[in-house]
Amino acid sequence: MPSLHIFYGGTFDPVHVGHLAIARAAHAALQAPIALIPSADPPHRPTPGSSSMDRLRMLQLAVSKEPGLSADPRELRRAARQNRPSYTVDTLTEVRSELGPKTSIIWLLGADAFVNLSNWKDWQMLPELTHLVVANRPGITLQTQLPPKMATVFNHRWVQDPATLRKTPHGHLWLLNQHPNPSSASKVRAAISAAAHWEADLTPEVAQYIRTHGLYGIHDIN
């Protein structure tokens, strides 16, 4: 079977059970290992609520018992080395250089991130570097929420059979239909801030890390 390399990027601030559900579903559907890549402070979103090293450590804890999943710190290392923002297109250019022009590469992302892809640096270049696997998310309808300029670039690239992704190195999109999980990082952070119940959206290891390190203002909660 031709090799397939899957990368799942995100802020993971913090990593929650919804992220893990998407990664598990992709791993099961595509039968390939998945490297989860925490982003550096993203240029197109507000600064994360925890440090990059906290986010990496939480991600490592979350995937430590997940077969086929691993944490990849390359984007954090590159941002620290170059002292500038880190972009997905840079990460994929680096990965493509490492793996060569004929290797099948997938960038996994949620539908909520995909519909905002036109805010990303050089987003039109992504199909020349990778396939995109888009996981459905609650409240997102791709047919109606995709901006026209994105529809022009992507609509002819969708495939129905995921086996196509192994046969070509880049350029296709496939919809990962999984049971959408309503968890979100913003929901977790808001729940911590409001002293509401939040642990159920996280693995026990990540929840304990947040408590131990006082992230998201938890030590301010009485």
Swiss-Prot record:
GO terms for molecular function: ATP binding; nicotinate-nucleotide adenylyltransferase activity. The keyword Transit peptide does not apply. It is an enzyme of class 2 (transferase). One of its GO terms (biological process) is NAD biosynthetic process. The keyword Cell division does not apply. Its EC number is 2.7.7.18. It catalyses: nicotinate beta-D-ribonucleotide + ATP + H(+) = deamido-NAD(+) + diphosphate. Gene3D superfamilies: HUPs. Keywords: ATP-binding, NAD, Nucleotide-binding, Nucleotidyltransferase, Pyridine nucleotide biosynthesis, Transferase. Pathway: Cofactor biosynthesis; NAD(+) biosynthesis; deamido-NAD(+) from nicotinate D-ribonucleotide: step 1/1. Belongs to the NadD family. Catalyzes the reversible adenylation of nicotinate mononucleotide (NaMN) to nicotinic acid adenine dinucleotide (NaAD). HAMAP family: NaMN_adenylyltr. This is Probable nicotinate-nucleotide adenylyltransferase. It comes from Xylella fastidiosa (strain M12).
